[in-house]
Amino acid sequence: LTGQNIPVTVHMRQEGGDVLGALEEMLTVARVLRIPVHISHLKAMGRDNWGTKIPQALSMLEQARQEGLDVGCDVYPYTAGSTQLIHILPPDFLTGGMEAVVPRLRDKDARRELAERIRRGDGFDDIAKLAGWDGIRLTSLHCPEDHPYQGKSIAEIAALWGQNPLDCCCDLLVREHCEITMVDFMATEEDIVTILQSP
């Protein structure tokens, strides 16, 4: 690809706390390979990043353009995303597929480790931390006894069950064999407008 005018369009590896580090990696790719780079769905996920990371990211892109690089971005135009609930788990927790994940979710020691990793943050886009348990709403549940919880947040369900949100989430994942979808609210309208208004 070096020196060819073939654009590389990417979803960055991190869109939360290290979104600027991930952007710098892609700008380095543009510099080293001398190719156009387009960032797809630029966003800064998580309340801690709202209003601060996007202006910095846009400034980095503008500076790169002033250096002569052909770089740009588009915007994810929604404040929420939709995916499977298992994506609150670190990628390595999913090793072995659902046949391994479900027993792991039952294990109290594994849950304690999971809680610590979510609290600490360890490099993955941690949806539980970025959206908050109140920002994760369940959109499909298969077991009839869970149907009343459709549309409710993990925080709401945990309060109804008298549990902490992580245990509630793990219990639901076990019962539903990890086949739960969610809407996660982790972006802000202000950042979307800022990106849309940038040159």
Q: What is each residue range found by the language model?
A:
Residues 1-33:
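Hydrophobic, small-residue-rich alpha-helical packing segments that form membrane-like cores
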